[in-house]
């Protein structure tokens, strides 16, 4: 198997090799962003669920966040709506970082793969024209080799898009818990 991979890269053009390396980097980035954000969002979600539970039970007055250290009006025992909104926006901004990488990868990887395929097919037709051979037995292996770049692009895009949707849902869940805390703290008198 390793020999066939080496043979493929030896027979491929520069652009196809570049495209496959690029798509491989995309795949590594996809896995890294997904694993990292999954862990971070799981921790944040657990923290905000606990914070909401503590606020509802009266165990704490505000979320465990540096923005709430001594920012409460002690006379009314309330936090300003502006502070609550700023906290909410900060949590959402932090939780969505990295998602744009998955979005870009899922939308561009197929086109990068297609570009590699088109260039490889153009090179193949150029070589076929120079040789004067145009039989199916000659064309089929060249086109199948060229289509590997498109397949690789699609292969990189599918997990990127799937992981994007999974993480987007986790961010939504986090935003619901944050909004519930904002609503509760805004309604306290």
Curated annotation (Swiss-Prot):
Location relative to the cell:
Cell inner membrane
Work out whether the entry's keyword set contains Transmembrane helix: yes
Give the CC-aspect GO terms.
Answer: plasma membrane
Q: Give the transmembrane ranges.
A: 14-34, 99-119, 147-167
Source taxon at top rank: Bacteria
Its membrane topology, per UniProt? Multi-pass membrane protein
What keywords tag this UniProt record? Cell inner membrane, Cell membrane, Membrane, Protein transport, Transmembrane, Transmembrane helix, Transport
Family, as annotated: Belongs to the ExbB/TolQ family.
Name it: Putative biopolymer transport protein ExbB-like 1
Q: Name its species.
A: Helicobacter pylori (strain J99 / ATCC 700824) (Campylobacter pylori J99)
């Amino acid at each position: 198997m390793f020999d066939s991979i080496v043979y493929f890269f030896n027979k491929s053009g520069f652009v196809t090799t570049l495209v496959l390396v690029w798509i491989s980097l995309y795949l590594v980035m996809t896995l890294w962003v997904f694993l990292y954000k999954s862990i971070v969002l799981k921790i944040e979600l657990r923290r905000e669920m606990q914070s909401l539970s503590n606020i509802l039970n009266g165990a704490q007055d505000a979320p465990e966040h540096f923005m709430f250290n001594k920012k409460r009006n002690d006379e009314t025992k309330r936090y300003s709506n502006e502070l609550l909104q700023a906290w909410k926006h900060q949590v959402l901004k932090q939780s969505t970082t990295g998602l744009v990488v998955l979005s870009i990868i899922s939308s561009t990887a197929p086109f990068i793969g297609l570009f590699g395929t088109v260039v490889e097919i153009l090179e193949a037709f150029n070589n076929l024209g120079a040789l004067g051979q145009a039989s199916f037995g000659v064309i089929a292996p060249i086109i199948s080799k060229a289509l590997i770049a498109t397949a690789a692009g699609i292969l990189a895009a599918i997990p990127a898009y799937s992981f994007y949707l999974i993480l987007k849902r986790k961010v939504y869940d986090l935003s619901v818990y944050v909004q519930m805390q904002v609503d509760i703290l805004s309604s306290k008198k």
